[in-house]
Design a protein with these regions (language model features):
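Active-site glycine-centered loops adjacent to acidic/histidine catalytic or metal-binding residues
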Residues: 23, 73-74, 101-102, 183, ...
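N-terminal active-site segment of His-dependent metallophosphoesterases
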Residues: 1-84
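His/acidic metal-ligating clusters that form di-metal
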Residues: 57-68, 149, 158-256
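Residue-level marker for buried hydrophobic side chains located in beta-strands
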Residues: 18-20, 69-71, 98, 180, ...
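Acidic/histidine-rich helix-loop elements
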Residues: 22-53, 107-130, 190, 222
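Short, solvent-exposed beta-strand-terminating loops
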Residues: 13-36, 105-106, 181-205
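Extended active-site neighborhood of metal-dependent phosphoesterases/phosphodiesterases
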Residues: 7-10, 80-179, 203-206, 256-278
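The substrate-binding groove and active-site-proximal loops of carbohydrate-active enzymes
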Residues: 44-48, 73-77, 154-159, 219-224
Length: 279
């Protein structure tokens, strides 16, 4: 696994360092889940042949550097007993704080419309693999007088919920600098343009203005259309001075973006771990 480095100035009296990773996409399955799942695993392994090696390297790096892992989702590629066992074993033996992605709840990868009902089919089983609430939680990390509140929220389906916005406001009220952890990056124009050029289709971002997704094919338009709460969420983040950085994934490319003209948005593509030092 490659290792990248970033330094983000947020005015701390002492530095705080973490490991950011995303989109590992473990592809394990065996006979316990049936032949269809075994075949899915074989097909998806071709997309992510180094997933196990990268996760092992990430864990080794975390232990050697004594840094917590801030993972922004898709640690597994689909729901299976073997994937859940691997995820739980990793979480039990490493310091990992998790913001879920969309693939955490994917049963067969693209076989159905993914929404709250779809997610809830496997949510309890996936949640049991991790120590923190993977849909909405916070963790304060300190170094002497320095402190950062890492706030992990699930936006794997391209939207935010009212309760997530309320939770973020509660965290802001604590008065600590915040690093927002999400799976799907937030829209800003340069990232949008680059993402569309790279994909040849849609941008796969949250909060894209409607006029910029009108030419998406119908499935992607429905999937990525910004609702009122998501628009309000982005407006709040843009205006809140305590939100200092965003960690994200989903795009399968390492990319440094700036949200709202001021907030660094660090996107992990899955092939590298990034040591992020806040100071």
């Amino acid at each position: 696994m490659n290792v990248a480095y970033a330094k983000i100035e947020i005015g701390l009296p002492a530095p705080i360092r973490v490991l950011h990773a995303s989109d590992t996409h473990l592809t394990h399955a065996d006979e316990r889940d049936g032949q269809r799942k075994v075949e899915l695993a074989k097909n998806r392994l071709a997309c992510f042949p180094e997933a196990d090696e990268r996760l092992a390297a990430l864990g080794k790096l975390s232990l050697e550097m004594e840094l917590p892992i801030m993972h922004t989702g898709d640690l597994i590629d689909f729901v299976s007993l073997a994937n859940m066992e691997a995820a739980k074993a990793f979480a039990d033996s490493h310091d990992i704080f998790m913001a879920t992605g969309n693939h955490e709840f994917s049963l067969y990868v693209g076989e159905a419309w993914e929404d709250e009902d779809y997610r809830n089919q496997s949510l309890a089983k996936i949640q049991a693999c991790y120590k923190n609430d993977i849909r909405m939680s916070s963790r304060v990390i300190r170094n002497g007088d320095a402190a950062i509140n890492f706030v992990a929220l699930d936006n794997g389906y391209y939207y935010f919920e009212p309760r997530q916005l309320a939770f973020l406001k509660e965290q802001v009220a604590l008065g600590l600098p915040i690093v927002l952890m999400i799976h799907t990056p937030l829209y800003e124009r340069k990232l949008y343009d680059d993402a569309r050029a790279r994909s040849g289709g849609c941008a796969y971002l949250a909060g894209v203005p409607d006029e910029l997704i009108e030419d998406y094919e119908p499935y992607r338009y429905r999937q990525q259309k910004t609702d009122a709460t998501t628009a309000e969420f982005l407006e709040y983040v843009a205006a809140e001075p305590l939100i200092k950085c965003i960690l994200a994934g989903h795009l399968h490319v390492d990319y440094d973006s700036t949200f709202a003209g001021r907030i660094p948005q660090l996107i992990s593509g899955g092939s590298a771990a990034r040591v992020v030092e806040f100071y």
